[in-house]
Amino acid sequence: MASSASSTADGVAVVGSGLIGRSWAMLFASGGFRVKLYDIEQQQVTGALDTIRKEMKLLEQSGALKGSLGAEEQLALISGCSDLREAVEGTVHIQECVPENLELKQQLFAQLDQIVDGNVVLSSSSSCLLPSKLFAGLVHVRQCLVAHPVNPPYHVPLVELVPHPETAPATMARTYALMRQIGQSPVRILKEVDGFALNRLQYALIGEAWRLVEARIVSPGDLDLVMSDGLGLRYAFIGPLETMHLNAEGMLSYCDRYREGMKRVLKTFGPIPEFSGAVAEKVHQAMCVKVPDDPEHLSARREWRDGCLMRLAKLKGQVQPP
C-alpha cells in the first residue's frame, strides 16, 4: 500500500520511462523528491536511467540544471524498477506517463486502484483524454486528476491540472502545491473539456494557419514567421488577454475599440480543415526545405529547439515584471 504523506512525504512514482516519464523523474528529483521510475521491461528502465544521467550532466555543464542540488545528488534520488507494487510503495504522488491510449491507461489505473490507499494522488500525463473516461469506476476517484505537461516538460513549465467531476478539492490543491514546489507553472482547469485549455488554443491557431495556407493567402514558411517573429515573441512573456489589456487603456478600452473588427474577422473563419491531401503535401514539402524529415535532421532541430527553450526559460527567470 502507498504510505501516508506524514511518513514518506518525499516519495513519488513515475509510471512509464519514455520522454515524458524521464522528464517528470528529473523534475521531481530537482525538487528533492525520491523518485521510483517504473516500466514493464527492466531493459527500458535501465536505458531511461542512462539517458537521465547523460541529460542531467549536460544540463549541469550548461548551467541549466534545475533545483538547488547537484546532478549527482539528484541522480541519487532516482531509482528504477519493473514491479508496479514496489514502484508505488511509500509514495504520495503517482505520475502516469504511458502511451496516449485510453484502454491502456484505464487498465493501469485499475491496477493502481487496487494497490494504493487513500493518501496517494493518482495523476495522468494525458494531453487530451478526459478524466471522466480515464478514471471511470475507480474506488479512489477523489484522488485522481490529469496533470498535463507541455513538451519538453523540463524546459516548458506549464502543467494543466484537470479534475474528474468527483476529484476532491484537496487533491487539486496538493498537486498544485507539488507542481509549484518543483518549479512548474500549474494552471487549474476548473472543469473538464475536450482538449483542455492548451490544445484548444493550439488547435484553433493551427486550424486558421491551415486555412490561410489552403487559401493561398500566405506561404507555410511565412505563416510560421508570423508566430515565431510576431505573436510568439510577446506571448512568451504575456498572454493574449494581457496583450489586449496593454494594447489599449485597459481591457474595456480594447473591447470598445476593437470588438467590431474582431467579430467581423471571426465571422470569416472557414470550416474545420481535413489536414490531408494536397495542402498537407504542400506544408510537408515546405517544412522539409527547412528541416528534412530524416531522423538525423529532425533530432538536430529538436535539440536546437530545446536549447532555445532552455535559454528562454533562463531569461524569463531573470526578467521579473514590475
From Swiss-Prot:
It is found in: Cytoplasm. One of its GO terms (cellular component) is cytosol. GO terms for molecular function: L-gulonate 3-dehydrogenase activity; NAD+ binding. The keyword Phosphoprotein applies. Keywords: Cytoplasm, NAD, Oxidoreductase, Phosphoprotein. The modification Phosphoserine is found at S6. NAD(+) binds at L19, I20, D39, E100, K105. GO terms for biological process: fatty acid metabolic process. It is an enzyme of class 1 (oxidoreductase). The keyword Oxidoreductase applies. Inhibited by malonate. InterPro entries: 3-OHacyl-CoA_DH (IPR022694), 3-OHacyl-CoA_DH_NAD-bd (IPR006176), 3HC_DH_C (IPR006108), 6-PGluconate_DH-like_C_sf (IPR008927), 6PGD_dom2 (IPR013328), NAD(P)-bd_dom_sf (IPR036291). It catalyses: L-gulonate + NAD(+) = 3-dehydro-L-gulonate + NADH + H(+). Its EC number is 1.1.1.45. Belongs to the 3-hydroxyacyl-CoA dehydrogenase family. Has high L-gulonate 3-dehydrogenase activity. It also exhibits low dehydrogenase activity toward L-3-hydroxybutyrate (HBA) and L-threonate. Homodimer. This is Lambda-crystallin homolog. It comes from Sus scrofa (Pig).
